[in-house]
């Protein structure tokens, strides 16, 4: 009985000490959760494709729930759904893009060494780097890489006449690239603050 009571008291003391030293609303914990949430987009770009979408979406939603719970009474809580949407939109587009590339037929024009495929790989690496460590330089590099990949893919579509099925696949690839670009340029995205070329909204009361 005494041993059980001592164990219970020690657990209670440990719980109180942990809550005091490492409160669940600590800024470092929120920062860690947001970093883990962004890492889901990194995984979408590079992780093993088999079962990736299920792992990606469940992991992102679990982290979003944790971050939202911790931020419920914090003024930065509005960042939680913004990052959630940015990660889900960009990550799903990256997964869709990778699936389309993985199912391309064995043809020299679709080889990973072709310029348009290399442009897409460059974009994927830049996108991963941006979500791993967001900053203005990485944003600029990612946007430029997406534009290059779009141009290269469009040139490939115009360079020859693929079969109907292959053309549709290339068009879907192009659509996924455009979706990534749109997500990057979304003015409501948390990445919008990194866009140094975004239009400046006029302030209320400013003279015209």
Curated annotation (Swiss-Prot):
Question: Recorded GO terms, molecular function?
Answer: transmembrane transporter activity
* Swiss-Prot/TrEMBL keywords: Cell membrane, Membrane, Transmembrane, Transmembrane helix
Q: Does the keyword Transmembrane apply?
A: yes
Please provide, in alphabetical order, the Gene Ontology terms of the cellular component aspect for this entry: plasma membrane
**TM segment ranges:** 7-29
Q: Where in the cell is it found?
A: Cell membrane
Broad class of the protein's primary localization: membrane
Q: Does the keyword Transmembrane helix belong to this entry?
A: yes
Q: Please report the record's description of how this protein sits within the membrane.
A: Single-pass membrane protein
Record's function text: Involved in the resistance (detoxification) of the fungal toxin fusaric acid.
Protein name in UniProt: Fusaric acid resistance protein FusD
Species of origin reads: Burkholderia cepacia (Pseudomonas cepacia)
């Amino acid at each position: 009985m005494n041993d059980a009571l001592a164990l219970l008291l020690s657990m209670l003391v440990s719980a109180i000490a942990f809550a005091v030293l490492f409160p669940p609303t600590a800024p470092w914990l929120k920062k860690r959760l947001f970093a883990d949430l962004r890492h889901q987009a990194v995984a979408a770009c590079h992780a093993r494709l088999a079962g990736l979408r299920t792992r990606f979406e469940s992991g992102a939603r679990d982290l979003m729930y944790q971050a939202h719970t911790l931020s419920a009474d914090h003024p930065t809580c509005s960042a939680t759904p913004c990052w959630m949407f940015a990660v889900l939109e960009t990550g799903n587009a990256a997964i869709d893009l990778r699936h389309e590339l993985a199912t391309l037929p064995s043809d020299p024009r679709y080889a990973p060494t072709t310029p348009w495929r290399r442009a897409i790989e460059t974009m994927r690496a830049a996108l991963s780097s941006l979500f791993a460590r967001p900053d203005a330089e990485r944003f600029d590099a990612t946007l430029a890489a997406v534009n290059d990949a779009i141009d290269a893919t469009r040139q490939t579509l115009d360079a020859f006449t693929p079969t109907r099925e292959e053309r549709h696949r290339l068009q879907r690839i192009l659509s996924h690239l455009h979706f990534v670009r749109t997500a990057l340029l979304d003015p409501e995205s948390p990445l919008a603050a990194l866009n140094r070329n975004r239009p400046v909204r006029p302030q209320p009361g400013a003279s015209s």
